[in-house]
């Protein structure tokens, strides 16, 4: 029961950061999306980060233009997830296709460059 309550608190804390179709990262959902052949976009953020907010705004718009992709976000202070993706900085953007990482950027907030990366992943 204690583990369940900890899990619920953890889920609620991180789910508040999801925007639009973006989902707080979970390994199970990430693996499922990849196994279904979807292009997966993963972004990292941290509270009070202006470049993170800028990138999230671009991704929020991109979700409408690239609806066939799956979007996940995680707080970069979550060391387990950060290590899994080898992410050391907030505003890191990753794109996966065919079970492989095909794009990585750090600090990119320019709509044109993010859209180019998304288009090249289709």
Task: List PLM regions with ranges.
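Sec-dependent N-terminal signal peptides
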Residues: 4-13
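Short acidic active-site motifs
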Residues: 29-30, 79-81
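Short active-site neighborhood of thiol/selenol oxidoreductases, capturing the structured segment around
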Residues: 35-47
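N-terminal leader/targeting and pre-domain segments
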Residues: 10, 18-37, 120
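Typically the conserved alpha-helix immediately C-terminal to a functionally engaged Cys/Sec
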Residues: 52-65
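Thiol-based oxidoreductase modules, predominantly thioredoxin-like and allied folds used
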Residues: 44, 67-80
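Non-catalytic, surface beta->alpha helical segment in thiol-disulfide oxidoreductase systems
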Residues: 97-122
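Structural micro-motif
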Residues: 85-94
């Amino acid at each position: 029961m204690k583990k369940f309550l900890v899990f619920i608190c953890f889920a609620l804390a991180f789910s508040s950061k999801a925007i639009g179709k973006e989902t707080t990262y979970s390994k199970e959902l990430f693996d499922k999306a990849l196994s279904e052949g979807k292009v997966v976009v993963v972004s990292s953020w941290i509270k009070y980060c202006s470049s993170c907010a800028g990138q999230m705004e671009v991704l929020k718009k991109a979700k409408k233009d690239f609806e066939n992709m799956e979007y996940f976000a995680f707080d970069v202070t979550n060391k387990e997830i950060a290590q899994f993706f080898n992410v050391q900085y907030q505003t890191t953007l990753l794109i996966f296709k065919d079970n492989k990482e095909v794009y990585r950027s750090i600090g990119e907030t320019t709509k044109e460059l993010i859209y180019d990366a998304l288009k090249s992943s289709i």
